[in-house]
From Swiss-Prot:
Participates actively in the response to hyperosmotic and heat shock by preventing the aggregation of stress-denatured proteins and by disaggregating proteins, also in an autonomous, DnaK-independent fashion. Unfolded proteins bind initially to DnaJ; upon interaction with the DnaJ-bound protein, DnaK hydrolyzes its bound ATP, resulting in the formation of a stable complex. GrpE releases ADP from DnaK; ATP binding to DnaK triggers the release of the substrate protein, thus completing the reaction cycle. This is Chaperone protein DnaJ. Residues 5-70 form the J domain. Zn(2+) 1 binds at C150, C153, C203, C206. GO terms for biological process: chaperone cofactor-dependent protein refolding; DNA replication; protein refolding; response to heat. GO terms for cellular component: cytoplasm. It comes from Nitrosococcus oceani (strain ATCC 19707 / BCRC 17464 / JCM 30415 / NCIMB 11848 / C-107). CXXCXGXG motif repeats lie at residues 150-157, 167-174, 189-196, 203-210. SUPFAM superfamilies: Chaperone J-domain, DnaJ/Hsp40 cysteine-rich domain, HSP40/DnaJ peptide-binding domain. Binds 2 Zn(2+) ions per monomer. Its cofactor is Zn(2+).
Length: 380
């Protein structure tokens, strides 16, 4: 007895989505589950049938093989890869009926056949942005090599002025059935590849493929706050599908260029602010850059090199909304260089006036005491 068509078993169309297949399976599984139908052999067999159908149709690779070759494509020894056109292993329906099937339909498949409709490939584009562009948002123009729908035939693959016709091999059903003795085998039509239509006069521009290779320019809106690693999906902007299939998607991968002043960590910005040792000692107010203009940074007297000061709200606003991050300014005290004689003498007088008082340089004196104890303990 021939196996029932898997789509028919689940009560769904051949173009049903994964969600529709799952919904149909759950409904039928609840209805025919053996626990709900004890001692009901018919319900048990029905449950096994829908389980087998779901196992195949819920797996993308198996579903593709089934759509191409029917039950033989997913039986024992069948090649599981989508687009695989052979069978491996021991005897199966493909081995039994393969030659007979090809004798009947093989010649017709080579004349006026139609390519199977395939979804276009997804594309990826790496987009380099400046930090300013990433923080403020921008519109970027990109140019990508891709397949686009053939304008001459509008993606149908048929010669302009003509249209695909009903497949004479399967009568537009997309499936053909072979009977050999007690066995019946249903196969995807080898001439129209399951579409039910064929292109009798292919388009000369795209050679019946329904798409051509060219460059495409797009304007991509970049939202404020994007960061390296963020990905923007442009639905339907990937490669055009083959033979009228749906297009793929374009994924724009964001990469932020290095900045001469700022570094970024999440929503926070970091920068180094060099100050003179006099300004660090006396304290004061400094002008520091932000991505929105100048800002005032107050540093207290006695500021040490490496201290970090926070300017709230001067960082990056999150891409999904919310309060802006902070700008963290690391003070780097700069030692003066290229001193003239007068300047050197002034510094020497300044050093003498300090009189090595602990209160002026507590860390230095603490370090000296630590070194002294170290040498005493080591008995150098």
């Amino acid at each position: 007895m021939a196996k029932r068509d898997y789509y028919e078993a689940l009560g769904v169309a051949r173009n049903a989505s994964d969600a529709e297949i799952k919904k149909a399976y759950r409904r039928l599984a609840m209805r025919y589950h053996p626990d709900r139908n004890p001692d009901d052999k018919a319900a048990e067999e029905h449950f096994k049938e829908i389980q087998e159908a779901y196992d195949v149709l819920s797996d993308a690779r198996k579903r593709t093989a089934y759509d191409q070759f029917g039950h033989a494509g997913v039986g024992a020894g069948a090649s599981a890869g989508p687009g695989g056109h052979g069978f491996e292993g021991g005897s199966n329906f493909g081995d039994i009926f393969g030659d007979v099937f090809n004798d009947i339909f093989g010649a017709a498949a080579g004349r006026g056949g139609r390519r199977q409709a395939y979804r276009g490939a997804d594309l990826r584009y790496n987009l380099d942005l400046t930090l300013e562009e990433a923080v403020a948002g921008t519109t970027a123009k990109i140019r990508i090599p891709t397949y686009v729908a053939c304008k001459a035939c509008e993606g149908s693959g048929a010669k302009p002025g003509t249209s695909p016709i009903t497949c004479p091999t399967c009568g537009g059903h997309g499936q053909v059935r072979m009977q050999q003795g007690f066995f019946s085998l249903q196969q995807t039509c080898p001439r129209c590849h399951g579409s039910g239509q064929i292109v009798d006069s292919p388009c000369s521009t795209c050679r019946g493929e329904g798409r051509v290779r060219e460059h495409k320019t797009l304007s991509v809106k970049i939202p404020p706050g994007v960061d390296t690693g963020d990905r923007i999906r442009l639905t339907g902007e990937g490669e055009a599908g083959e033979s009228g299939g749906p297009p793929g998607d374009l994924y724009v991968q964001v990469q932020i260029k290095a900045h001469s002043i700022f570094s970024r960590e999440g929503d926070a910005l970091h920068c180094e602010v060099p100050v003179s040792f006099v300004a660090a000692a006396l304290g004061g107010e400094l002008d520091v850059p932000t991505l929105t203009g100048r800002a005032k940074l107050k540093i207290p007297a006695g500021t040490q090199s490496g201290q970090v000061f926070r300017l709230r709200g001067k960082g990056v606003s999150p891409v999904r909304g919310g309060s802006a991050g902070d700008l963290l300014c690391r003070v780097m005290v700069e030692t003066p260089v290229n001193l003239n004689q007068e300047q050197k003498e002034l510094l020497e007088k300044f050093e003498a006036s300090m009189n090595r008082n602990k209160k002026h340089s507590p860390k230095h004196h603490s370090w000296l005491e630590g070194v002294k104890r170290f040498f005493e303990d080591m008995k150098f």
